Amino acid sequence: MKYRYATGAAVLSLCLGAAVVQAQGYYYLPPDAGPEFRFGIGPSFFEDGRFTQFGGPVSSKVDYDTGLAFDAALGWNFNKYVAADFETGFIGAKINNVPGFTSDNSRLYNVPFLFNVTLSCPIPRTNLIPYVGAGVGVADVVFDTDNFNDGVTTVTGSENNVVFAGQIFAGLRFQLTGHLSVDLGYKYFATGDPTFSYPPSPNFDVGFRGARTHSVLAALRFDF
């Protein structure tokens, strides 16, 4: 929650600061500069992972079902070529199989908090705008299970761990109006390795290799 407050405060300060200096006549905003908001949704394909800890070191392949990705971002267009934003959202999938373990309704969720920079290249005399970008920050990773066991020890419930996260992305945006566009984009997202502490003892750790995901998202973007 504190990351969301920090993101909102930072973007609000950025927008208010720009408005004040413009009103005072000290700074002229270039064409196409201003705030923007976007959100997107689509399928997410998790690379096969590794199960690394279950009360001690283990090594098993993790097979994921196709997951879901959603993101929302608020930011600032410096001009028609460069923009920066703060993004959060959701990237999660159900665990299909971990050899040697029973997994009942087990899922891995990632809630990212990222700072992105986007470079756009409008194609002259068209409404098409290709773009590429990258982002860094953290992700709150949640492991949620109804029953995960090795035949001896069982863990249930949800635990979370905050780890480093980053992404790269690219896509093609179509300008519908001066303030509204749609786009189709690809995103590669990766995190550090999360570890979750469960009963029966405070040090019973459940660990995974960090997520490596490929998402295809359809998005709406509003420029103000």
In which residue ranges do the predicted regions lie?
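Surface-exposed strand-loop-strand hairpins of Gram-negative outer-membrane beta-barrel proteins
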Residues: 43-70, 158-161
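Short coil turns and loop connectors of transmembrane beta-barrels in diderm outer membranes
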Residues: 31-33, 80, 123-127, 176-178, ...
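Membrane-embedded beta-strand positions in outer-membrane beta-barrel channels/transporters
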Residues: 36-38, 71, 114-116, 167-169, ...
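Gram-negative (and chloroplast) outer-membrane scaffold detector with strong preference
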Residues: 24-28, 43-45, 73-150, 210-224
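Cleavable N-terminal export/targeting peptides
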Residues: 1-31
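Predominantly the C-terminal beta-signal and adjacent terminal strand-loop region
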Residues: 93, 168, 173, 177-224
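Outer-membrane beta-barrel translocator domains and adjoining extracellular loop/strand segments
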Residues: 49-56, 96-102, 142-153, 195-202
